[in-house]
Amino acid sequence: MITISQLSKHYKNKTVLSKVSTQFPAGQLSSLIGPNGAGKTTLLMSIARLLETDEGQIQLDGRNIADIRIADYARRVATLRQSPDFNLRLTVEELVAFGRFPYSRGVLTDEDQQAISDAIQFLSLEPLRQSYLDELSGGQRQMAFLAMTIAQQTDYLLLDEPLNNLDIKHAVQIMRALRRLCDEYGRTVILVVHDINFAANYSDHIVAMKNGALYCAGPVSEVITQARLTELYGLDFEITHSKRGRLCNYFTPSGELA
């Protein structure tokens, strides 16, 4: 479990995180939702130790992450940043191999090679194994970066807007893969997501943020309600349920804001 206690972050006179306290349950898929500027990415990057905070504490399974060596942390927590970009011309297999760096330090063992193959197979990327990243579609490239993160074989995966700029098919493929990581392998997945319907239908746990503060958090059924989403986003929501899941409808025929 990841526990956040009174976390704050400031940039000069601007507060981007204000005394945030919440938890991300182990073995579950948690989605960070909220309007732009809510502090979602700042919180995620703080957990990833890619951003220093000014106040508060983050604990990983009861231990302050500041007390964990960076090398050890990289074997527990993997991070996929928004729109990752490599300037090197790499094949899919070469990219995925970067996920083994916390273990191999550049010298791949048989165990590393197996982890690479397992990650590629998990995401059905075998036909693209020797393809170069610049030859792939945006969705295929994002799947390759996700495979790199999976190859790191950490207990926790942090993903910043992994569905950004993807078509519906690739977005569904990624969310299904993340769901499988939780259900079949017991991984803990935390992601920032803007599409409220993906969050509502693939998550176990939701953390909603607004204006740098925690708005609410809990199981999907407690957070994804008409009243809470309307207040969170300032739009008129209608939520319907079917055998296929929840549909959060915020469209108005007139095109006017609520």
What kind of region is each of these model predictions?
Residues 97, 110-128, 153, 158:
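Conserved ABC ATPase "signature" region
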Residues 233-258:
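ABC ATPase nucleotide-binding domains
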Residues 132-136, 140:
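Conserved ABC ATPase signature
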